[in-house]
Amino acid sequence: MSSLIALGKRQTLLSHNEFLNFKNQKGFCKRFISQLNKKSNFPALAMTVPEATKYLKSVSISVPYVGSYMLSIALKSNRRAPSARGQIAFPHPFQEPPKICVFAKGAAADEALKLGATYVGAEDLVKKIQTEPLEFSKCFAHPNSAELLPQVAKLLGSKRLMPSIKRGTISDELKPLIESALTAVDYRQNDAGSINLPVGKLGFSDKELQENIEALVSNVRFTLAKLPGKVKVTVKHVHLSASHAIAIPLQYK
């Protein structure tokens, strides 16, 4: 005899004796859910994307086209593992293009402006940054203006925007840098061992959201596979949340 427990559209099979053993113990709910987790590839309450969006939309208080979905990818690793960081260009973009600052002179400056950079210049740009509250989220430099960077190193460094050769943000090839910055979104692993990133608007169709989620999870796995060192880092759980709504564990491939 067995007890069939239905969770959403998923079903988990426990023997009748297992069910009774858990039911008669203290902390039944917590232990029962834990046992379900061990018998499944996903957390016990994991849902498909359509199931999750149904609940998230019903409890979110944001206007549909203003609120966003947030994906949280929990990583399985240890303290010796390097931190993961990368970029992704979503198949269905939904965020405003970032404001870009470029230190360059002459033809390189003209090219940067044509490509869509917000602030471009050399000595004049240094003065603006020192005296005006310019807002930008990306910063690059051409070698012909790199010597000016020490003058704004403290201001840019505190915002993690200081261009450097090591990070590839000082280059005589500005076109790929600017084009990538306008279409791709950066992500990085936080101190809690998770990667959190918006993946779409509440007005997205399930198909659009599903494709963005799959793209991000695949991108993160590719990034994890390239991490240096012998410590293996993998995806542990994936949760989807919305503006002012709870996080729901997702089934994922």
Swiss-Prot record:
Family named by the database record: Belongs to the universal ribosomal protein uL1 family.
Any single biological process term in GO: mitochondrial translation
Location of the protein in the cell: Mitochondrion
GO cellular component terms attached to this protein's record: mitochondrial large ribosomal subunit
Gene designation: mrpl1
Keyword presence, Ribosomal protein: yes
Pfam families hit by this protein: Ribosomal_L1 (PF00687)
UniProt GO MF annotations: RNA binding; structural constituent of ribosome
PANTHER family: 54S RIBOSOMAL PROTEIN L1, MITOCHONDRIAL, LARGE RIBOSOMAL SUBUNIT PROTEIN UL1M
Its job: Component of the mitochondrial ribosome (mitoribosome), a dedicated translation machinery responsible for the synthesis of mitochondrial genome-encoded proteins, including at least some of the essential transmembrane subunits of the mitochondrial respiratory chain. The mitoribosomes are attached to the mitochondrial inner membrane and translation products are cotranslationally integrated into the membrane.
Keywords associated with the record: Mitochondrion, Ribonucleoprotein, Ribosomal protein, Transit peptide
Domain of life, source organism: Eukaryota
Name by which UniProt lists this protein: Large ribosomal subunit protein uL1m
Record lineage: Eukaryota, Fungi, Dikarya, Ascomycota, Taphrinomycotina
Transit sequence range: 1-81
Record-annotated membrane-spanning stretches: none
Description of how the protein assembles with itself and partners: Component of the mitochondrial large ribosomal subunit (mt-LSU). Mature yeast 74S mitochondrial ribosomes consist of a small (37S) and a large (54S) subunit. The 37S small subunit contains a 15S ribosomal RNA (15S mt-rRNA) and at least 32 different proteins. The 54S large subunit contains a 21S rRNA (21S mt-rRNA) and at least 45 different proteins.
InterPro entries linked: Ribosomal_uL1, Ribosomal_uL1-like, Ribosomal_uL1/biogenesis, Ribosomal_uL1_3-a/b-sand, Ribosomal_uL1_mit
Keyword Mitochondrion annotated: yes
